[in-house]
Amino acid sequence: MVNYTITEKEIALALKHVVTNISPLIKPTQSLLKTVYLILKKRFIDNYRFVILEAPTGSGKTIIGLIFNFTYSFIVSLKEEGLNIEEIDLSEYDLLTYDVNGYYLTSNKVLQEQITNDIKRFNLKSVMSIIKGVENYECIPATDEFNDLTKIPNKLRERIIKKNPDAKFASYTYRKCINYSGEKLRKKFPECIDICPYKCARNTASYINLAVLNYAYWLNVMRVPKNPEVKKYFDIRNVTICDEAHLLPDIVCNLFNLELTDNILVKINNKLDDIEKVFSFNQKSLEVKEHLKKCFKFFKFPINNFSEVITYCEDMLELGELLTEMMKEYNSVSKESFRNMYGDIFDDLFDDIASYEDYLDNMSKLSERPEDIYFESEKNSNFDIQKYKHIIKDLNESRTVRKNCIDKIDFGLFMSGTLGNMDEFAKLLGLEENEYTKMFLPSTFDFTKSPIYLTDSGYLNYNSFDSNIDRILDVCVRITKLHENEKGIIHTATFKINNMLKERLMNDRSIDFSRFLFYNTTAEKESLLSIMKQSNIPYILVGPSLYEGIDLPDDQCRFQIMIKVPYAQINSYVKKKMERYPFWYKRNCIEKIIQAIGRSNRHKNDYSKIYLLDSLFDKIIYETNDEIIGRLEYKKMR
């Protein structure tokens, strides 16, 4: 991070110029401008590398991020030219001409949609662009095949429909060019280069001043800096803005945990069976078969020693070498017919196997820190043959976040309405004390019509659950009758409670069961959420994972019920994590409570009622924040 000589007045002048010129439709409040000014001051004068900002719903986090990025870009461009901002006529400098500067990272589709709308609304296409996951982009040649009803059987269509019955096109996931890049891609698919929706979006985002990416996409492109094909599009930028940043530690750790299954071995084994029918086996294919048996053994039993993981990674790399030799032998005999039939398939498998080089490197380094190793084996009960899935985690999570995320950031702005103790958050990120500073924005919402009721309906801890759950579910049903003409959410905390409530409702003839929307998968949840938003029926969305990424303003949600305090389920991994980060368990629960309450009351004059049923809420709710505590009322539901 480069430090510049700059005055407070220069920052103020640059900020004023940006706000005046960026878009006439952006009209920030004085409070918002003061926030941006203070962030800039902490970066350029106080020389902090990271700013942690707790800003509640409705405080304009997106606009704060946009104005900060463009002002930062403007200041740096002028300072790189050696200019004193107080001594020049800023009207002669076009702030929209400056180069690549920042990333704006989001956690979910709701935020991406909001930013997409802001880009259109504020006419920011020349300085800001969004790139989504590849499944959101159409592959034109694959879609042509998908829509070819004369092709029987249409295997591509069958694959896509099986995964998504409502699919209208073939996404980039199913692209024909999957194993091609560079000059080979141009020769094989010349017509795709300039019209591919995904590649066009990627190209635009790669040279735009502010690129909007989701966390997973950004983390994946940052993890392969040695790949020139990736680096030419995305590299470390001056600014990285993280929205909903409270999710960042879990997102990073979940992405970089190693989960090993035998899926790739099954694919290879199936292809070998096909090859045998067409070409018969040769000596090399028999060697591959024998080596496969060795690899499969890794999944027949739980892991007892971490060295088994390293050995398996080595075995997979050896498998790749054997497959390469096998293909050479088949190609020499079949005069390229083998390559034509199976080349693309094996190229894909080789890419998967190549990942084991990184796995082996990471696992070898982790083995040097035995105190940080955690592994578990989950029995797969979906098959007649007993086999296991193996999960390996690094217990030093702050180190994982630091290495794979923080070290890829030049200057970082972390924003969320749910940061709680910001020093704890900084510790989870692996930040040093002298690297970061903290800021807090109070809510400007009017909560006078939005009480949060502590109903003290019974304890749902382990010892009291069975004796109280039926009574609490009855209370839940009675509350829904009080809001029979209003939409709402019921947070069940677990699928067990979810199913118990579902059964309770189905057996109650006084209830219109069709009003309650239950889901089993993320896709179902998103579909039901869309139905709920678009319908006038007073639906109630019910589930254990409705804390994040849901925007239900006004009549879309007038009440919420939280049945149980959302503590994480205690297992061996959670116990280990609690030993390492004693504050994490309670912090994780508080985050979920605050996020859940925030699904309604989406703007200053919005209102809703919140019902907390589990008596354990009384023990933790006072550790949330002042806005929530100020809304609390005790109310027995009889």
Briefly describe each language-model feature range.
Residues 47-68:
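Walker A/P-loop
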Residues 186-206, 222-230, 331-454, 518-525, ...:
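A contiguous, basic/glycine-rich beta-loop/short-helix subdomain that forms a polymer-engagement track
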Residues 2-16, 74-211, 216-219, 283-287, ...:
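A substrate-engagement module of RecA-like helicase motors
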Residues 71, 113, 117, 191-331, ...:
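Signature of the SF2 helicase/ATPase Hel1-core->accessory helical subdomain module
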Residues 456-466, 523-620:
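Conserved RecA-like P-loop NTPase helicase motor core
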Residues 492-521:
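Conserved helicase motor "Helicase C" RecA-like lobe of SF1/SF2 P-loop NTPases
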Residues 456-493:
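Conserved interdomain hinge at the start of the Helicase C-terminal
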